[in-house]
């Protein structure tokens, strides 16, 4: 097996990360990394990705719209969802509850990282180049 979510969490870069939900999925292999910049991200992923987001793409959507987006992501069988904390997002508590529900149902790891942590420090993605 290749590089897994557990391998990613074991990296020094992720020492301040917090695994919120989906611990049962940390053995999933990572096949790529994608930043969520728009709600239609599901069109551009094939599965196995780690998705990075500050939830900005979902800033103003309703909880119902957000539930639909997350359901589509779950169908794609992403390897993990990494959420950068500290963003102001409408209905944040409701949206996090939706993420928790799907993470527990599908075992998709949800990892929270501090706001000040850079998403891609130099050299951090070298493990995908092997």
Task: Map each language-model feature to its residues.
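Alpha-helical/coil-rich non-catalytic "connector" segments in signaling and regulatory proteins
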Residues: 1-130
């Amino acid at each position: 097996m290749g590089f897994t979510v557990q391998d990613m969490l074991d990296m020094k870069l992720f020492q301040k990360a917090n695994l919120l939900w989906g611990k049962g999925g940390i053995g999933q292999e990572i096949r790529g990394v994608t930043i969520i910049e728009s709600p239609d991200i599901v069109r551009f992923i094939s599965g196995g990705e780690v998705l990075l987001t500050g939830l900005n793409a979902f800033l103003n959507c309703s909880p119902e719209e957000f539930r639909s987006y997350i359901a589509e992501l779950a169908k794609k069988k992403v390897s993990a969802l990494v959420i950068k904390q500290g963003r102001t997002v409408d209905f944040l508590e409701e949206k996090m509850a939706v993420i928790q529900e799907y993470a527990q149902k599908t075992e998709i790891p949800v990892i929270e990282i501090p706001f000040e942590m850079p998403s891609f420090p130099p050299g951090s993605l070298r493990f995908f180049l092997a």
